[in-house]
UniProtKB/Swiss-Prot annotation:
Disulphide bridges, residue numbers: 51-67, 144-209, 175-188
Annotated GO MF terms: serine-type endopeptidase activity
Organism: Mus musculus
Domain Peptidase S1 per the UniProt entry, residue ranges: 22-245
Protein name, as recorded: Chymase
Family: Belongs to the peptidase S1 family. Granzyme subfamily.
Active site, per annotation: 66 (charge relay system), 110 (charge relay system), 203 (charge relay system)
Subcellular localization, as worded in the UniProt entry: Secreted; Cytoplasmic granule
Known catalytic reactions: Preferential cleavage: Phe-|-Xaa > Tyr-|-Xaa > Trp-|-Xaa > Leu-|-Xaa
Function (record text): Major secreted protease of mast cells with suspected roles in vasoactive peptide generation, extracellular matrix degradation, and regulation of gland secretion.
């Protein structure tokens, strides 16, 4: 199966590594998603990469484990990531907490917490996002929204502005072609009959259901055809709570 994790490599050659964006969605109203974080990553190979994430505490961002790097800078308060505004806050990451069972080959347990060196200042442009409760098993059929700075089309350059797209939770059978899909710890999201999906650059962004973060964008088929796989946040609340409590 040709899986494609959704982070964005900026300096590699080849079409499979170009920047990406939400497909079939719309531009967010500026600063209507004040918890969104744009992650500027220097990889272990010294490439520049990018992901999405979201602020859950003044000093913690939640994202995907495959967005880990040698160093990460977090941009908060952004709508257009290329046009500086007074709302911007740029903060360095002090420590990256990858889930201890994360497997980069199977792309399971794809979740990471980032502790910031300084606490973010909560403003109209910067805020936190509530998480799904412990073991709150959200059922298939719910309509949710994915948010990120990924591609708007497979062959298009990355979006400068924050995008969002409506995506419906699917039965686990819809993701059976992903051999490592695990229903208890992952969500199968997106109608296979509609070209509305996350793509490169959206990794680590939230899946919002009734204003609550239920998932984290993880991977999709290389051709961008839905459904996509999101990490199921409720499954990891005990681990998240432990990291927050101890740090």
């Amino acid at each position: 199966m040709h899986l494609l994790t959704l982070h964005l490599l900026l300096l590699l050659l080849g079409s499979s590594t170009k920047a990406g964006e939400i497909i079939g969605g719309t531009e967010c109203i500026p600063h209507s998603r004040p918890y969104m974080a744009y992650l500027e990553i220097v990889t272990s190979e010294n490439y520049l990469s990018a992901c999405s994430g979201f602020l859950i505490r003044r000093n913690f961002v939640l994202t995907a484990a495959h967005c880990a790097g040698r160093s990460i800078t977090v941009l908060l308060g952004a709508h257009n990531k290329t046009s500086k505004e007074d709302t911007w806050q740029k903060l360095e990451v002090e420590k990256q907490f990858l889930h201890p069972k994360y497997d980069e080959n199977l792309v399971v347990h794809d979740i990471m917490l980032l502790k910031l060196k300084e606490k973010a200042k909560l403003t109209l442009g910067v805020g936190t996002l509530p998480l799904s409760a412990n073991f709150n098993f959200i059922p298939p059929g719910r309509m949710c929204r994915a948010v990120g700075w990924g591609r708007t089309n497979v062959n298009e350059p990355a979006s400068d502005t924050l995008q969002e797209v409506k995506m419906r939770l699917q039965e686990p059978q819809a993701c059976k072609h992903f051999t490592s899909f695990r229903h208890n710890s992952q969500l199968c999201v997106g109608n296979p009959k509609k070209m509305q999906n996350v793509y490169k650059g959206d990794s680590g962004g939230p899946l919002l259901c009734a204003g609550i973060a239920q998932g984290i964008a993880s991977y999709v088929h290389r051709n961008a055809k839905p459904p996509a796989v999101f990490t199921r946040i409720s499954h990891y609340r005990p681990w998240i709570n432990k990291i927050l409590r101890e740090n």
